[in-house]
Amino acid sequence: MNQISINNVDYIYSDGFEALHDINMSIKKGERVAILGPNGAGKSTLFNMLNGIISPTSGEVKINGLDTKVKKNLNVIRRDVGMVFQDSDDQLFNSSVMQEIAYGLVNMKVSEEELQSRVKWALNVVNMDGFEKKSPHNLSGGQKKRIALASVLAMKPEVLVLDEPTVSLDPRGTIKLVKLLKKINEEMKITIVFSTHDMDIVPLFADKVYVLNEGKLILQGGVKEVFNNKKVLRNINLRLPRVAHLAEILKSDGCIEFDELPLTIGEIRKCIKNLKGGI
């Protein structure tokens, strides 16, 4: 059974704007799935359906077989699907890190002992031990992102949904966050669904990609399969990973002929070593 099933979903806002049209997606437990598309493609609307913030106008969204339209399912769905917003300041509103991470647990009515244990565990996972008494609002952008993530992890979700997780992070912060998310996925078997405009992190992290444009699903498949549809991506103002673009230039200049398009530094380095007999 798919962990997330999205079947024939449409969503129409009250003003008549159709944000999503006939969307179908299947996501299995433990997958890392990138949702790509230009601004206004429908990504945020889709994400808001995954834990029942909004319901489809037609079609269905199911999490572990539970329909998000059924009100009695929502407590379980919202426990199982953790949302991390694009702007951490939209998610952090308590006066201390401890209170921030404990907030959802208090609402779940877990015991004090369990609460303390989960807060400590979540901070350890995101490498923020010792920050319990600090104010979230005085932290750096990268630290805020980790605290927001910890507050969701403390709920022990089965799925993490991240809206533009690397936005506003510097290159070092981006790499650290990607490594952390990969560790969470691999060690805890948590499914991760994320949107991004940073094409360079997609081949480093995702194993499946869906591409939306104007509310419609226009591409889906493995990372290489999707990025090989270069014309489609460029027509909706999405770029290739920079390494892939460099490979295109080298090929068009007659410098190197690649058997398949490299997407990461590691892949292009391997191609060049194979062609040149090692460097």
From Swiss-Prot:
User: Which UniProt keywords are listed?
Assistant: ATP-binding, Cell membrane, Membrane, Nucleotide-binding, Translocase, Transport
Q: What is its EC number?
A: 7.-.-.-
Can you supply a Gene Ontology BP term from the record? cobalt ion transport
Q: Where in the cell is it found?
A: Cell membrane
Gene3D superfamilies noted in UniProt: P-loop containing nucleotide triphosphate hydrolases
SMART domains on file: AAA
Q: Which Pfam families match?
A: ABC_tran
Q: Which InterPro entries match?
A: AAA+_ATPase (IPR003593), ABC_transporter-like_ATP-bd (IPR003439), ABC_transporter-like_CS (IPR017871), ABC_transpr_CbiO/EcfA_su (IPR015856), Co_trans_ATP-bd (IPR005876), ECF_ABC_transporter_ATP-bd (IPR050095), P-loop_NTPase (IPR027417)
Q: What is this protein called?
A: Putative ABC transporter ATP-binding protein CA_C1368
Origin species:
Clostridium acetobutylicum (strain ATCC 824 / DSM 792 / JCM 1419 / IAM 19013 / LMG 5710 / NBRC 13948 / NRRL B-527 / VKM B-1787 / 2291 / W)
Give the lineage. Answer: Bacteria, Bacillati, Bacillota, Clostridia, Eubacteriales
